[in-house]
Amino acid sequence: MALLKKRAHAFDMHVQDMTLRITASPDLYEECRASAMQFWDQLHSFALRNQRFGTSKLPVELADDAPPLMMDIARKTALAGVGPMYAFEGAVTDYVGRFLASQSGEAVISSGGGYFALTRKRTKLTVFHGEEKDDGLAIVVDPKFGQLGVYTTMGRRDLPVESVDGLIVLASSCTLADAVGVYALGLMAKPDPLKKTLAYLQGIEGVLGGIVIRGGDIGVAGAVEIAA
C-alpha cells in the first residue's frame, strides 16, 4: 500500500486475528483500538445469538429490531448475493475507517487483501492482487467518491487460483467490496468468466468498478482510474 501524503502516521493494530495497517493523522492508536474492539465484541456477540448470521453462505434476513450495524452488513451482503460471514473483516475495517475519518478527516487502512480509503485529495493507492510483490496496480482514489472500500485477491485464503489471476473490486464500503469479491470469484470458475464477472460488477448498487485479470486478459468495469 502506498499513500502519497507527507505527514501521515502509520501503525499496525491487531483485532483478534486481523492485522490492520493504518495510515492516519494524528496518531489515534488507543482510541482506534478501543473503538475496534467494541465493534468486534458487538459483532461476535450478535453472531453467537443469531447463528445463521455467522454461518450462512447465503443472504440472511434479520428481524426489524436488529442493531443498525448488523442490518447494514446483512443488507450489503444480500446485494452481493452472499451471507454476512463473508464480510465480517470488511465491516471491522469500515468501522475503524469511519472512526478515524471522524477524528482526522481522512484515513487509509489495509487488512489482508482489503483497503479502506478516505482522502481530501486525489491519491495514488497501490493495491496488490496476486502472490508476488510485483502483482500490483496503482489506482487513483478520488475524493468525489468519499469512503472507498477495495477488495483484492492478495493474501486471501482458499482462493480458486486456477480460475483467476487477479481481482480488484472498488465499492462504497469494505463490507460491500468483500461480499462482491467473494461472489465474483465464483463467477470466475464458470464459462466466459470475464464477461459474466464484469456484468455482475456493473449491476450491483454501490460498486464503483472493478478489474478482472485472467491469463493475458484484463477486464475493467465502471469508474476505475489506473494511475500512470
Walk through the language-model features, giving the residues of each.
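N-terminal subdomain of lithium-sensitive/metallo-dependent phosphomonoesterases centered on the IMPase/IPPase/PAP
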Residues: H44, L48-G54, V92-L100
